[in-house]
Amino acid sequence: EMTPDIFACILQYPNASGNVEDYRTFVEKAHAANCKVAVAADILSLALLTPPGEWGADIVFGTTQRLGTPMFYGGPSAGYFATRDEYKRNIPGRIIGWSKDKYGKLCYRMALQTREQHIKREKATSNICTAQALLATMAGFYAVYHGPEGIRTIAERIHSIAAYLEKNINKLGYKQVNEQYFDTLRFALPDTVSAQQIRTIALSKEVNLRYFHNGDVGMSIDETTDVSAANILLSIFAIAAGKDWTKAEDIPVNSTISKALKRQSSYLTHEVFNKYHTETEMMRYIKRLDRKDISLAHSMISLGSCTMKLNAAAEMLPLSRPEFMCMHPLVPEDQAEGYRELINNLSEELKVITGFAGVSLQPNSGAAGEYTGLRVIRAYLENIGQGHRNKILIPASAHGTNPASAIQAGFTTVTCACDAQGNVDMDDLRAKAEENKDDLAALMITYPSTHGIFETEIVEICRIIHECGA
């Protein structure tokens, strides 16, 4: 029921169990009640399923991990966010549009910049700047290389393996409960089989499955699943049921998706997704783009403080090893001891480097780190009975993400002046801190500053803020 206090709905497509719902009627009711609809969608499934924009969704979002980014134990992947044209001035992140250079040549450049935090600062629509640009580039090149036909072939192959497993595991006495699905199956077990039996057999074959609280068992297929893996999965259920099974030599293309849910429209229609489908073409295309880029291979480049680093090729090389790439984030902890040791070691080293007692490795960008720090400060202040403190002092030289993050975390901002060299104006800092001392929560300062300067007065700056109770 759409009560008056509901302003939006979030739907999953497919849902967490893998079932694909037909939301058309629900979306009509939501819009009739003046509710917006946001959909978390598996981007690869949309090669086969009707896209949410065609059945009325206002926003579609998700991760592009499925477009060529390995699991990395739940590590980074780029998100995607799509919406209607009418909302373009409110969406987070960068928008790129067509323009012309001074010679009249068509070019790409940032568009609608007046909505972004480097101009709008505390009035920006988000604190996002360039988080996960590398992963977004990888996903883009994946789509360029495979093109619409290649993407569809991959999606059809995944769905066909799922359909094959549904058909043959059902024959063994199980019941697949997802009425419609893309790549994920959920099986109700017969009375003669327990989830623990299946778990024991699966682990003996080095397979992890999903075990639901009600006793159901689930699995998800992806582009790395081949006929051999499908046979292993089938054998697990057959052995548990004590029944014979036939090994597949090949799995034909098949679809169980209903006509109402099947995608009919085209996608990836831009010419760039339809030109570079061989290794040589792709390599030359990437190199042409590379020649247009300014990087550390050419000269000094301006970098934000959260990206003042250089990852050498030698450091990137280990990331191509399957031990790093292929670890699923939900594996049992005893199967991820190496990863956990890396995480723990890095956390301990960062504690020593920073001089702090605790570390979070969850933030995926500088902007996310800012937000995390501010939320920790807010929680601390509330815990000591100082929750009324809601002002953040920020130097005028700070990157726009700083005031934007402060607003996102529920604070208000007070700007502190800087001198001609970009240093904090100490007199103005003292005055602003004293003026707001009863409500001051924190100072947000970049070290080195956005100008690349280490504040020589940093110790005195911290003393002033602490004296004000912040």
What are these regions (language model features)?
Residues 1-107, 169, 173, 182, ...:
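Conserved PLP-enzyme active-site core in the AAT-like
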Residues 4-10, 118-120, 144-150, 177-181, ...:
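Gly-rich Lys/Arg/Thr-decorated short loops/hinges at beta-loop-alpha junctions or inter-strand turns
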Residues 67-168, 172, 177-179:
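Active-site C-terminal subdomain of aminotransferase-like
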Residues 69-82, 86-87, 131-135, 220, ...:
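Conserved phosphate/anionic-ligand binding catalytic regions in large, soluble enzymes, centered on
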Residues 159, 172-201, 221-224:
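Conserved PLP-binding catalytic core of the aspartate aminotransferase-like
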Residues 177-184, 211-218, 364, 406:
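Short Gly/Ser/Thr- and Asp/Glu-enriched loop/turn motifs at secondary-structure junctions
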Residues 227-302, 306-314, 319-325:
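Flexible inter-domain linker/hinge segments
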Residues 278, 323-364, 369:
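Conserved N-terminal alpha-helix of the aminotransferase class I/II PLP-enzyme fold
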